[in-house]
Amino acid sequence: MTADRPALRTGDGETRLSFGSNLSSFTEYLRGHAPELLPENRIGHRSHSTRGGDGMESGDLAPHGTTIVALTYKGGVLLAGDRRATQGNLIASRDVEKVYVTDEYSAAGIAGTAGIAIELVRLFAVELEHYEKIEGVQLTFDGKANRLASMVRGNLGAAMQGLAVVPLLVGYDLDADDEAHAGRIVSYDVVGGRYEERAGYHAVGSGSLFAKSALKKIYSPDSDEETALRAAIESLYDAADDDSATGGPDLTRGIYPTAVTITQAGAVHVSEETTSELARRIVAERTEEGGSAR
């Protein structure tokens, strides 16, 4: 149990902040003291229309991140994402980072409005670090999932204007009974509902339908890390093959999917050398097969 602490006071004796349940939440602290810094409040609001002056929907005015996939494997879990961001029918960026380590045993991928999503995930990482510093212990994985759900729910106003954020959270559950199956995947909807994905794999974003269809055929819950990573990259390749908003491996520019693996040893960014080698191998194999999957 956290010990009771006295309130902080300013020089004139005015009580400014009472240590309590909200102090361990950096997001709630911002909401009370600087709400304009929250991701959902850093956009302009339209009172009557969701269209901009050029007739574009508000959701098309900002770059959107697209496809993220997650897989559990024996002893861990991984998260991978493509690099493309789109703005309407245009490619806004070819090398966006969509996969982030949020603490030692968790990572989050983003789909939706890129600017808001990136700020939200970075704030989530600060939230976890802040909690650990204040309370002296890490949040459990369920606690992390609930915190992120609350933050996504806070973006509902922006989502109603077409600026939705849909993260995908993965982590290694230190409280799991079976270390071989301690990897966990949690998905969210735009109103902050959280859903445990127990199939062992999941995908979000515009290419998620194609990525999940690919994973359904090649995923194995008892695969090792390298096999799972290959499956993730291959599913992103299949998603890019059918979804114009998902970027496949770009051999010309040297742009490849990014990935994070999480095991009992912690979260690690997969090196570009590893992802590029796997991507090139997959492209070569598909070329030999005339573009078809094996």
From Swiss-Prot:
NCBIfam families on file: 20S_bact_beta
Function: Component of the proteasome core, a large protease complex with broad specificity involved in protein degradation.
Transmembrane intervals: none
One Gene Ontology molecular-function label: threonine-type endopeptidase activity
Keyword Nuclease found: no
Pathway(s) served: Protein degradation; proteasomal Pup-dependent pathway
Assembly with partners or alone: The 20S proteasome core is composed of 14 alpha and 14 beta subunits that assemble into four stacked heptameric rings, resulting in a barrel-shaped structure. The two inner rings, each composed of seven catalytic beta subunits, are sandwiched by two outer rings, each composed of seven alpha subunits. The catalytic chamber with the active sites is on the inside of the barrel. Has a gated structure, the ends of the cylinder being occluded by the N-termini of the alpha-subunits. Is capped by the proteasome-associated ATPase, ARC.
A GO CC term assigned to this protein in UniProt: proteasome core complex, beta-subunit complex
Regulation: The formation of the proteasomal ATPase ARC-20S proteasome complex, likely via the docking of the C-termini of ARC into the intersubunit pockets in the alpha-rings, may trigger opening of the gate for substrate entry. Interconversion between the open-gate and close-gate conformations leads to a dynamic regulation of the 20S proteasome proteolysis activity.
GO annotation, biological process: modification-dependent protein catabolic process; proteasomal protein catabolic process
Top EC group: hydrolase
Enzyme Commission number(s) of this protein: 3.4.25.1
Lineage of source species: Bacteria, Bacillati, Actinomycetota, Actinomycetes, Mycobacteriales
Removed propeptide positions: 1-65
Gene name for this UniProt entry: prcB
Homology family: Belongs to the peptidase T1B family.
Cited CDD domains: proteasome_protease_HslV
Organism expressing this protein natively: Rhodococcus jostii (strain RHA1)
Annotated protein name in UniProt: Proteasome subunit beta
Active site residues of this protein: 66 (nucleophile)
Entry-linked Gene3D superfamilies: Glutamine Phosphoribosylpyrophosphate, subunit 1, domain 1
Reaction(s) this enzyme catalyzes, per UniProt: Cleavage of peptide bonds with very broad specificity
Keyword hit for Cell cycle: no
Cellular localisation: Cytoplasm
Keywords: Autocatalytic cleavage, Cytoplasm, Hydrolase, Protease, Proteasome, Threonine protease, Zymogen
